[in-house]
Amino acid sequence: MIRIEKLTQSYCLNDINCTLPSGKLIGIMGANGAGKSTLLKTIAGILPLKQGEVWFDNQPLSNMNATEKSQHIAYLAQNTQIHWDLSVYDVIALGLAATLPKEKERSKIQAFSEKFAVTHLLDKPFQQLSGGEKARVQLARCCIKESPVLLVDEPIAPLDPYYQIDMMEQLQSLTPQHTCVVAIHHLSLAYQFCDEIVLLEQGKLLAVGETQAVLNAENLAKAFHIRAEIDPMKKTISKIEKQ
């Protein structure tokens, strides 16, 4: 469980209080500039706490050292780039400790490449992959740490529709063994895949809770200035238009 108490970050976040349950796929949503990335980076410990606290179960983030943060949290930034000439195997290996024996390294990489369906790509140069293939490999790199919490910033933004769905399916498959928190703009995919939503409006918490309760007509109008057709039975949001 992640508990956020009275979290304030400069001009980006203002007195955020919420609890994110363990083992769920949780979407962080809001218009551009609402504070989604800032919230993720603060939970990850990348941005220092200015005011308030983030708790992982009963452990405060402010008391965790770099090793403890790495053990608890895996973070995948938006548009993460690999600039070196590495194979897919080498990229996934970046998520492992350098001191891990080679035999264990090979075993773990084989297991996680199978999990994310990239085994056939292991010897291929990472830079030659498609955007969707790169996304899978990057997710495997993060998940191979086996941290209980995975934070992902806008993972589907650069992907085509097939790989957008694929990425959400991959994240969903990690629950309930892991808690996955993802910043996401895509309303219909968030509505379909996320268990819960944290909805931000101009740095403030507008709503938090089960997806169908949060992504209702009133909240969509407040957060995004749009109207849409919502079908809770089919888990779809369609016919989105400006107010």
Give names to the regions the model predicted:
Residues R106-L121:
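Conserved ABC ATPase "signature" region
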Residues A44:
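Helix-to-loop junction immediately C-terminal to a conserved catalytic motif
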Residues M29-A31:
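The feature captures the beta-strand-to-loop junction immediately N-terminal to the Walker
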Residues P125-L129, E133:
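Conserved ABC ATPase signature
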Residues L150-E154:
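Catalytic Walker B motif of ABC-type/P-loop ATPase nucleotide-binding domains
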Residues G52-P60, K69:
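Conserved ABC transporter NBD signature motif
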